[in-house]
C-alpha cells in the first residue's frame, strides 16, 4: 500500500466551490526587486494518466485521475529568479533598497557549490538546474516568504495533466514525434546544452518547454508500480509521498533526452549516482553535481492552506544521503 501525504490535502487541492470558478493567468512580482514570473491558469478536470498502448511498463495501467484547477509556471524557473535565493549578497544587490528583511534572511539557503552549476550552458534566461528535490522545495519556501503566496512543486499527476494540455495522444501535438523540434530542445536539436526558456512553441495551455530543455521535479516519490493503485478507480488529486531520498519523479525529458523520453506519460527518476562527484561526507542536501539536466517549474494551488500547514510542507527535515 502506498503511503499518502500526511499533511492536509489542501496543500495539493483547492476548495471545490472555488474550483468551479474560472482562473486567470497572472504575473507574480517580488516586492523590492525587479524580478517577476508568470503563472498560467490550468483548468480542473479528469484525464487518463499513463500510457494506454505502447510506452513503458511503469506508465501502466493508464488510470483515471481527477484534479482541481491550479496555476503552473509558464516557464521553467530560470537562474535570474533562482540565484537571489542562493546567495544573500546577490539578493541584496538585486534589491531596490540594498536590504533583505530579517524573515527573508532567516530562510535556509544552499551551501555554495564548488562547481559552476550552470555547467557553462549560460545563465540569463536559462533554466536553473542541478538542484536537489530538497533545494527546489526550499526555493519555494523563499518565494513564500518573499511573496506571501504558497508555491510548491507539481505533483506527478498535475505535471502530466498540464503537459498534455487536454490531448490524449503521446505528445500534446499527436502520436508522431516529427513535430517535436518545434516545441522542445532535446537530443536531436539541443547541441548538448540548455537554451533560453520560451524559444520554442508552447503547448495548448500556454506552457513553454514542458518537454525538454531540463527535466522537471515533481513532488512524488517514484515507484515503478504506483499506477496499479489507480486500476478501476478514479484517483482525486493523487500524490505519492516521498519517504526515502531516492528516487523522486522527474518529468519532461531534457536537452540530452531521446524523443520517446519527452512523451507526456514518460517517467524519470532521480538517482544517487547524480552525486557521485560530490566530495562532501555526507553528500550535499542541495546539489547534484552530475545532473545538469534537471530543473523545476512552480505550481500554486487554487486555495492556500494555513500558514502552519504550509510551513510543515516546507520544513520537512531533509533525508540524510548515503
Language-model segments: residues:
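Sec-dependent N-terminal signal peptides
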Residues: 5-13
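Sec/Tat signal peptide C-region and signal peptidase I cleavage site
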Residues: 15-19
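Disulfide-stabilized, aromatic/cysteine-rich ligand-recognition loop
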Residues: 21, 201-203, 235-322
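Short, polar loop/linker segments at the starts of domains and inter-domain junctions
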Residues: 28, 49-67, 194-200, 262-279
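Mature N-terminal segment immediately following signal peptide/propeptide cleavage
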Residues: 33-49
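Active-site microenvironments of metalloenzymes and redox enzymes
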Residues: 49-51, 66-173, 220-227, 300-322
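Short glycine/proline-rich turn/loop motifs
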Residues: 62, 110-125, 189-192, 277-282
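Short, well-ordered junction/capping motifs at the entry into regular secondary structure
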Residues: 184-211, 241-244
